[in-house]
Regions:
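Metal-dependent phosphoesterase signature
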Residues: 57-84
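Short acidic, Gly/Ser-rich segments with clustered Asp/Glu that frequently serve as metal-coordination loops
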Residues: 8-16
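Short, hydrophobic/glycine-enriched beta-strand segments
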Residues: 3-7
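Metal-dependent phosphoesterase core characteristic of DEDDh/y 3'-5' exonuclease domains
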Residues: 2, 17-21, 27-59, 81, ...
Length: 202
């Protein structure tokens, strides 16, 4: 089993209008992490940048301009993917996992398309696997205990000690998501969570 754990930071909520500014994650094969990556990247020409996104990511327009060019990041990222699958074999693809993963899937696909690369589907199985939905299913008996379903809130509910200053960094968020998945898996989908667990570090 080949899994791509991935999280993106973006300049807004619309993959058509807005851009990608960080791509981070890990590839695991048969439950063993074989590669990790963390790319900071400049928005593509024409990508809109919202003030809210800048505030969330604690970054300025000038700092974004100093980041690596999208083309070079795209080439490095494709090299990583090609190291672990054969894009010419329709049965050899990566399962994409994340928290609210359809958001990241849509942005990543559009990011490639904006750079005239249309073979995204050669690498990734559709649909992506959303850890948020697994948590929602498992926690339905204790749903009223969750004040919201943001990653940080849910992680705390599962007893994960947060480094709140690192939330909205793609590398930290996907690390958090992987730990959350481990805890969901230990309980089993028919398990339940009705109250917050004592926090423990990642």
């Amino acid at each position: 089993m080949k899994n791509l754990w991935i999280d993106l930071e973006t300049t807004g909520l619309d993959p058509t209008k807005h851009g990608v500014i960080q791509i981070a994650g890990a590839i695991d094969i048969d439950n063993k992490v074989v590669e990790e990556f963390d790319f900071k990247v400049k928005p593509l020409p024409g990508d809109g940048v919202t003030r809210k996104a800048l505030d969330i990511n604690q970054v300025s327009i000038d700092e974004l301009k100093d980041r690596p060019e999208p083309y070079s990041v795209k080439q490095e990222f494709l090299k990583i993917l090609n190291n672990h699958i054969d894009p010419y074999d329709k049965k050899d693809k990566l399962f994409m996992l994340g928290y609210n993963s359809k958001f990241d899937y849509d942005f990543l696909r559009k990011w490639f398309e904006k750079q005239n690369y249309t073979y995204f589907g050669s690498f990734i199985w559709f649909p992506p696997i959303d850890i948020m939905n697994l948590v929602a299913f498992q926690s339905r008996e204790g749903r009223t205990e969750f004040k919201n379903f943001k990653l940080g809130t849910v992680a705390q509910q599962y007893g994960i000690e947060l480094q709140e200053e690192n939330l909205h960094d793609a590398h930290y968020d996907i690390t958090l998501t992987r730990e959350l998945y481990k805890r969901v898996k230990r309980r089993g989908l028919n398990g339940s969570i009705s109250k917050a667990t004592e926090p423990s570090p990642l």
